[in-house]
């Protein structure tokens, strides 16, 4: 079974653009999976919600993401930054696919032969790397 680990921006993007998260993962992967939310991602979403910088669709997307991640497996993970947590978790565990559109994080993941799931054309997911 694959573990799908989304980063914060991926979650916000998905809910901002009303993409059916679970369906798109199933369509792109076509096998069993579980969605894993690392604690730094949840904490980052909570921090964003409290900040005054978010308005409109972004604030709604963060609210939706926080509500939706309650349905997924939450893993306590200690790291200084969310991206660091994602990269280390992916290195330490098998069958991990990281969902991100962050260019820098994608490059680090690909350097470590970790598959990456991205959003294409604001509506569907595509996986790069060895699966």
Swiss-Prot record:
Molecular function GO terms recorded: magnesium ion binding; RNA nuclease activity
Keywords of the record: Hydrolase, Magnesium, Metal-binding, Nuclease, Toxin-antitoxin system
Residue ranges of domain PINc in the record: 4-106
EC number of the protein: 3.1.-.-
Cofactor(s) this protein requires: Mg(2+)
Binding site for Mg(2+): 7, 102
Domain of life: Archaea
A Pfam family assignment: PIN_9
PANTHER family found in the cross-reference section: RRNA-PROCESSING PROTEIN UTP23 HOMOLOG
Family recorded in the similarity comment: Belongs to the PINc/VapC protein family.
Function: Toxic component of a type II toxin-antitoxin (TA) system. An RNase. Its cognate antitoxin is VapB4.
Designated name of the protein: Ribonuclease VapC4
Species for this entry: Methanocaldococcus jannaschii (strain ATCC 43067 / DSM 2661 / JAL-1 / JCM 10045 / NBRC 100440)
Taxonomic lineage of the native organism: Archaea, Methanobacteriati, Methanobacteriota, Methanomada group, Methanococci
Gene name per UniProt: vapC4
């Amino acid at each position: 079974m694959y573990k799908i680990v989304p980063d914060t921006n991926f979650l916000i993007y998905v809910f901002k653009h009303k993409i059916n998260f679970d369906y798109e993962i199933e369509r792109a992967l076509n096998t069993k999976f579980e969605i894993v939310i690392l604690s730094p991602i949840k904490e980052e979403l909570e921090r964003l919600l409290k900040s005054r910088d978010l308005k409109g669709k972004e604030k709604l997307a963060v609210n939706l993401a926080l509500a939706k991640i309650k349905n997924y497996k939450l893993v306590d993970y200690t790291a200084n930054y969310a991206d660091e947590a994602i990269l280390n978790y992916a290195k330490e565990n098998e069958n991990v696919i990281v969902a991100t559109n962050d260019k820098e994080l994608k490059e680090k993941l690909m350097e470590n032969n970790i598959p990456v799931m991205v959003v294409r054309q604001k509506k569907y997911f595509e996986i790069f790397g060895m699966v």
